[in-house]
Amino acid sequence: MDATLMVKSRIGSIRWSVTASIAAVAAAVAYVPAVRAQPGLQGSWQTLSTQMPINPIHAALMNNGLVLIVSGSGNVAANTNFQAAVWDPQAGTVTTQPVGWDMFCNGMVVLPDGRPLVNGGTLAYDPFHGEVRSAVFDPVSSTFTDIQSMKHGRWYPTVTTLGDGRVLTFSGLTETGATNTAVEIYTPGTGWSPEYAAGWTPPLYPRLHVLPNGNVFYSGSGTGSRTFNPTTHTWSAVIANTNYSGTRTYGSSVLLPLRPSSGYTPRVMIFGGGNPATASTEIIDLSQSPPHWQYGPPMSQSRIEMNATILPNGKVLATGGSLNDEDAATASFNADLYDPATNSFSSAGANAYARLYHSNSLLLPDGTVALFGGNPQRGTYEARIEIYSPAYLFNADGSAAQRPVITDVTAGPLAYGAGFQVTTPDASTIASVVLVRAGAPTHAFDMDQRLVELSYSIGAGVLNVTAPPNGNIAPPGYYLLFVWNAAGVPSVAPFVQLASSAPDQPPTASITSPSTDVTVSAGDSVFFEGTGSDPDGTVTAYSWSFPGGNPDSSSVASPGHVMYSTPGTYTASLTVTDDGGLSSPPSTVTITVTDGDISLTVSPSVMTNGGWVGHSANVMLVVQ
């Protein structure tokens, strides 16, 4: 049955109306920081009266401003009352509902249409076996619907939205308890692809990020980094190794802000992890050739089972975790704020309660961050919710800063590269416009997290903004749109939707001359000409190959005459490449080169002894 928690305000008293069993609350003692927080410098922390009635293991921010919480069995093996909930941060309510199977330890992202996708879960405990099932949640009707099952189960999978709106899933334990080493790709409305074997064994919940070139980058928790090509369905060899010698188990990974001013250079940062944990961080610039990991600044505390949340100003908030796994005695209460511009950490104050295994942090539309959960021991969890209000919401004296206001946004979905308008009376003061992907964190990782800065110009009471150029920069779906004023204060963010785009279609090559296979004599030449076409773009490159010919290659559409000197059979080919980087299948023609000598056989019909017979032959030599 449903359980509803009612509050008068965000920090007001709670009136309980509970008809379902509530999980036990962990008896954690509140941490009291030694130094009083300074809101204008560090931000501030508060604990809500609202509490989580189920173990909040998985969370997803939906485009109606509500947060889907998924618990399943809640890390209690004997619990068959599988649960989910919807939290309304503004109203202060949490409404629970049953789910049809155990979604504990799934992978979850929000589809481009706004529906959360739950992928896999728990088939059996100790040892764990993975579910083959997946489901989508409708934010309007608040119902789950099962979709096509995967080929094999996944417990602890990672799911990632690709640049065309499809969803990739990788790793997890199968229905037999083995590591699932295959990639599957889900197309909304169609179903799952065949399995694509990886050829290597990933960790559980691998850290994956979609890059601006469309490939998927694996950053850990293992030491060797790789990329996956969604077009060829293949993994690269290891392209870089981390400096930290151990695995960063339950550390976090963040794709740092993508900005047009830097050509959307992709940089990934990994935080903490390991047991005992490390405080170290590392950063890789994937525009370098070859890319390599470099140590970043250390956090103030070592963290395993931590959280890392990107804020709308591009800084990254690191919270929770502990030195030793699932150990409240070594919990990390300090909150650290990483600034990519200065490559340094500063203090974001301290939260009050240990946030360990199964804790989560989530950016909300008002620019605050919710910190909740923690489940170091089965049968108990931390039910209290904390809210971090960053320093950008305060003046230097600690009073509330005046925020810019967005009154309207062009109705979506927005097309890539298209212009749209943001109406604001504060247009003349705006210094930055950014999109932040609606979050979906679990197990120390937000699977689709990213921030993309937008180009814009200022008009009379409006901002003329340009959407990201393509889905690899910002995959289709819902984003929080923040505007920032010159004082560094953000607006409250409305949701905007980037339209799903069809997958890039490959171009087609055609050899027009010769139009059929040809036979020539050694020393002759053949005239070549070709064309290329692309159904959703333009052809940008031609590549000819002429085995046995001179020249043996060309990069123009019509290379002209190619000389063949050696007898044999050769296959000439043309391949074209489009503006999306996709190449066509080759167009081919066979060239048969014969010996150039002429042989005549004379067979007269009448011959007399001692007589002479005269014959004549006409030989025509055609030189092309």
Regions found by a protein language model. Name each.
Residues A486-G488, T577-L582:
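Short, solvent-exposed loop/turn segments at the edges of extracellular beta-sandwich modules
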Residues V35-A502:
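Kelch-like beta-propeller repeat domains
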Residues G419-Q421, A522-S533, S616-V622:
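A short beta-strand segment in extracellular, disulfide-stabilized domains
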Residues P404, P503-T508, I598:
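Proline-centered linker/hinge motifs at extracellular inter-domain junctions
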Residues S543-H561:
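Surface-exposed, flexible coil segments in extracellular/virion-facing regions
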Residues I511-P514, F528-S533, S543-W544, P559, ...:
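Residue-level signature of extracellular beta-strand-rich folds
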Residues T424-T429, G532-D536, D578, L621-Q624:
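Extracellular acidic, Ser/Thr/Pro-rich low-complexity tracts
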Residues G412-Y416, D517-D524, V606-A617:
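Short, solvent-exposed loop/linker segments at the N-terminal edge
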